[in-house]
């Protein structure tokens, strides 16, 4: 079996060459090793899975949009073909989400010894249940949405108690949790409230941000503000 250092180095090579499936396999090996992940390893694992799932989520959105267009045209034959193709993508999405959630729950959370790593992995758990909710329906959708809500809520409790309002992980959690409320729960008010609170809390402490976190923190704050602008203008349009 390859050493930890070799796995991490190979994961970096895979990232450079945009071979994200291989990057996932390398970082899964590291996650299954005895020691807790370092910050660098944690970020590599997150990037690997995010790219794999990101490509599949993009495919699913394109196919779903095409399906609606063909339905509107009344083109039943094409709709049938698209539905079969969409089901194939959904099976891949489901496998990917199951895979990352298993790694988080069996390897990463049990070894997480700092508040930072606990929040990071609980947020990640919330994210992948949220991705599950994007393409599922009925009871399955409710089940994964509930699990996403529970993971985000637990992460938020730890984050609010232990991490500074300007910490990039705390801000990233607020960003994704607010997206969950907006997209999965269709609760724009709650989404805006959460995003605004996180943004305001961070602004109040902006002069205390460590130099090494400033760029990441302000980038996520900008994303929070962008979403708030978008969501509040949507609400105005609907009125």
From Swiss-Prot:
Signal peptide: none annotated. InterPro entries: 14-3-3, 14-3-3_CS, 14-3-3_dom_sf, 14-3-3_domain. GO terms for biological process: protein localization; signal transduction. GO terms for cellular component: cytoplasm. It holds the Pfam family 14-3-3. Probable adapter protein. Belongs to the 14-3-3 family. This is 14-3-3 protein 1. It comes from Entamoeba histolytica (strain ATCC 30459 / HM-1:IMSS / ABRM).
């Amino acid at each position: 079996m390859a050493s930890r250092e070799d796995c991490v180095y190979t994961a970096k090579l895979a990232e450079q060459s945009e071979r994200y499936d291989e990057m996932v396999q390398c970082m899964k090996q590291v996650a299954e090793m005895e020691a807790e992940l370092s910050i660098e390893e944690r970020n590599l694992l997150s990037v690997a899975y995010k790219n794999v799932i990101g490509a599949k989520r993009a495919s699913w959105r394109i196919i779903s949009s095409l399906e609606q267009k063909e339905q509107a045209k009344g083109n039943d034959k094409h709709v049938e073909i698209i539905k079969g193709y969409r089901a194939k993508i959904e099976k891949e999405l489901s496998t990917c989400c199951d895979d990352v959630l298993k790694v988080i729950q069996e390897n990463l959370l049990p070894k997480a010894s700092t508040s930072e790593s606990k929040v990071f992995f609980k947020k990640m758990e919330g994210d992948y249940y949220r991705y599950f909710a994007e393409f599922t329906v009925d009871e399955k959708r409710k089940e994964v949405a509930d699990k996403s809500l529970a993971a985000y809520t637990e992460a938020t409790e730890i984050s609010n108690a232990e991490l500074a309002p300007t910490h990039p992980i705390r801000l990233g959690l607020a960003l994704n949790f607010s997206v969950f409320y907006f997209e999965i729960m269709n609760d724009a008010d709650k989404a805006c409230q959460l995003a605004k609170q996180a943004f305001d809390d961070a602004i109040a402490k902006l002069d205390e941000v460590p130099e090494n976190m400033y760029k990441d923190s302000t980038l996520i704050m900008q994303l929070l503000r962008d979403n708030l602008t978008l969501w509040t203008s949507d609400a105005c349009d609907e009125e």
